Amino acid sequence: MQRSLKWFASTTTVAMLFVLIGGALVTKTDSGMGCGRSWPLCHGQWIPDDITPQLVIELSHRLVSGLAAIMVLILCIRSWRVMGHVRETKPLAVLSFVFLVLQSLIGAAAVVWGQSDFVMALHFGISLISFAAVLLLTLLIFVVDKKFSPTSLQLDGQMRFHIYGIIIYSYLVVYTGALVRHTNASLACPSWPLCAKSRLLPVQFHEWVQMGHRLAAAVIIIWIAVATVHAARYYREQPVIYYGWIISLLLVLAQMVTGALVVFTELNLYISLAHAFFISCLFGVLSYLLLLALRTRRRPATAAGRSVEDTASAPLK
């Protein structure tokens, strides 16, 4: 595998991460209209006359997104040519580019015509799918060259249930978090983990949005913890699964801590961006576990108290 392709794939993955964080920055700083109702230009000008912080943030996000789109397109073409024989290459290439274009169109439509908060909450999730596809494509590039090549795996039905269920549910959690941001409900509840110390239940829309996200987040934390315990009991001999869940648990706990700190610090910008960063990384790890699950054969359920048998090493094909 060409070394240049590895470097380019890694750089493209980082660029996509900047797109995600940049989008969160635009939302957190309320810079979505920094360029007015003009797209792709700012206020209909190549070089705007009145430079404001919101304009700089919005324009920078557009430039980074445009550059990332070009890089993703090049990566798709190169990976298609070099490793088109790998069955996941073409679907991942299509997903990465199509969803990146889709999120750009939604962003442009929001600027020019405006969109509801419920539609705009999809924006981050769509970008997240594109990021995950690029990340998996990058990992495949290294795997094909027999680096980062995991052992051949056998997953029982319970582990498959955790992998499939958690990644689908995590997307719901991402949507509720994005809805919190777009409805300006981040500080609707001044207390944590309850909405207010004086009462148990929310009483108005923004509080329900905030508490709905907290409840969804609590469920995924517990679910990932359960999956991690299962991996620790039966998959220690398969490090890619065992450590994948350990990392997922650490990331979701970091997500919980930064979520609480967002409330306690009253929307500190750096903590808010860290919150977006951790969920992006978590979704990436879960996506890799999904890829592994789709590639592996099923094995009989593990008997209680027994560990998974060692399996022979084999490169992914």
From Swiss-Prot:
The chain crosses the membrane at residues 7-27, 55-75, 92-112, 124-144, 160-180, 215-235, 244-264, 273-293. Keywords: Cell membrane, Disulfide bond, Heme biosynthesis, Iron, Membrane, Metal-binding, Oxidoreductase, Transmembrane, Transmembrane helix. One of its GO terms (molecular function) is metal ion binding. Heme o binds at residues 61, 123. The keyword Acyltransferase does not apply. The keyword GTP-binding does not apply. Pfam families: COX15-CtaA. GO terms for biological process: heme A biosynthetic process. Interacts with CtaB. Catalyzes the conversion of heme O to heme A by two successive hydroxylations of the methyl group at C8. The first hydroxylation forms heme I, the second hydroxylation results in an unstable dihydroxymethyl group, which spontaneously dehydrates, resulting in the formyl group of heme A. This is Heme A synthase. The lineage of its organism: Bacteria, Bacillati, Bacillota, Bacilli, Bacillales.
